[in-house]
Amino acid sequence: MRVDKFTLALMNRRLVLKTIWERGAINKAEIARRTGLSLPTAIKITDELLDNRIVRSCGRQEGASGKRPEMYEFAGDCYYSVGIDFAPTVLRALVMDLNGMPVAKAKRPIPVPEDADAVIQTAAELIDQLLRESGIPLHRVLGVGVGVPGILDLDQGRVLFSPNFHWEDVALLEPLGRLLLQRTSIRWPMRLENSNRAMALGEQFFGSGVGYHYFICINLGYGIGAAAIENGELCVGASGTSGELGHITVEKDGPLCTCGNNGCLEAVASGRAIAQQARNLISSGVKTRILELAGGNIERVEAKTVFAAAREQDVAALDLVRRAGEYIGIGIASYINLLDPEKIVLADGMSNESLLIGQIQKVVKIRRMRFAGRRVKLRVSNLGEYGTAIGAAAIQLKTLLRQGGLSLTKEQEEAV
């Protein structure tokens, strides 16, 4: 296949920038060696990236004999990105630099998830608050990434269907961008991504997926979802719906799911499902510590209440956790048998519950095929509750690496 000069130049810029980003401090000769480019080409591209202000000099190489070569590094701490996670009950947002270092983060509850206008208004207020608190120059913010559960139109910035929010065909990026423009007088690039895939991006760039070419990130929270990274790229699917692990059927005649199907994994093993099952047990007269730990108010029973009771060896709570872990383990074992990944990363709130994770690991070991997944590593994420927001913010870093450099507005170029 013939490649035109423009495409070849872009490919080479991507290669050099990615090498500098991955390696940290590196000299031009080493860049040429690692990329396979000629030294003159490596020098030319590095100088262009210096002019683009995304690469900078970081001194001379230590320990080198003779004239010590100049070293270069990714200037990730000079630019920032905003990420926001539209979780079903709370908005989590952060401002971070392109090295993944948060400079401000906060969260706000969502009182009425069904009210899209109110949720978007709250999101704009939260982002504006964080930008003000961070004190960073706004012209150094490259854009805003948004993670939302459900089926999305990424090009149009719309939520086609989000069962957790009960949204259908909701415009998201346009009104959010307009509200931010009113508050900050800046129109930033806005990127939309499914929350599971955003979470996987966070793991790929800054978490347990660093250095892995093929891994799966599984979201164990209010809902259940998954996303795969293969050869460094997100697996999206033909219609953008890949990774809906929570909507595989595990009980033919199981409870109704928010998606409209019956017996989905999310309907029997998610945080929301565990809490509802506990309320049903209490209402049926089962004796359990769960209600006491919820302050005697059945409406305050949450998944975390059930896990707290399970840690106290409450029989009913232990049974709920065991049952959820068994279903999730079956789902993960099926993923391993189908896809044979290098690593599986368990993320979000329930991934911190050792009783649940222990049950999942036990079931996965039993249910996976004997020769499938022999090398797969099952690990818990270290990104914490802001993992999806980190991944949403990382969309700007991914875009920068794909473009082979910064793409600044005229106002940004004049201000930098």
Mark where each language-model region is.
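Phosphate-binding/catalytic loop of phosphoryl-transfer enzymes
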Residues: I84, L142-G147, I151-Q276, G391, ...
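ATP-binding/phosphotransfer module of carbohydrate and carboxylate kinases, centering on a glycine-rich
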Residues: M1-R60, A64-R140, L181-S185, K252-D253, ...
